[in-house]
Amino acid sequence: MKVYKKALVTGGAQRIGASIAFYLAKMGIDVAIQYNSSEKEMNNIKKKVMNLGVKFNAFQCDFSKDCDFDIFFEKVKKVHGNIDLLINNASTFKFDTIKKTSHKIFDKHINVNLKAPFFLSKNFVEQLSNKNGLVVNIIDQRVKNITPYFTSY
């Protein structure tokens, strides 16, 4: 089994992302996380991970806005080092229906759920320089269990 050394987990401050970050740290992998507004949760996972003796870095970035993912990834690389494991976990899911939605909600879903993983993966592959790496994209059960209440999601 390939042993990864440095991971980036988007949406890594809470829920599944925090669990993934903690698990990777228990495996001895240095962890960087991206979070949006969950600073309290970020500090909680930071304490847990740092108690394991691995390197931890957190990067606040709101993917829902027009984010320059190239600059974000370069910042992560500069502080944390080259990443060999990328977990695209960040997600947003706003309630809307086809009749009650907006460009703002639609753009937020596209930016966080599509653009962020796509462009972070692009940057990840470019920095690998012929080394092996792994990208894991976390998706929601709503991909198969569609409802009319999260239309743009």
What are these regions (language model features)?
Residues L134-Y153:
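Catalytic loop of short-chain dehydrogenase/reductase
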Residues E39, F59-I71, H103:
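The beta1-alpha1 cofactor-binding region of Rossmann-like NAD(H)/NADP(H)-dependent oxidoreductases
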Residues S121-K122:
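A short, exposed helix-loop element centered on a Lys and neighboring polar residues
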Residues N89-K94:
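Conserved NAD(P)H cofactor-binding loop of Rossmann-fold oxidoreductase domains
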Residues I29-M42:
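Conserved glycine-rich Rossmann-like NAD(P)H-binding loop of the short-chain dehydrogenase/reductase
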Residues A13-R15:
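Conserved glycine-rich cofactor-binding loop
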Residues T97-I98, S102-I110:
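Substrate-binding pocket helix/loop in short-chain dehydrogenase/reductase
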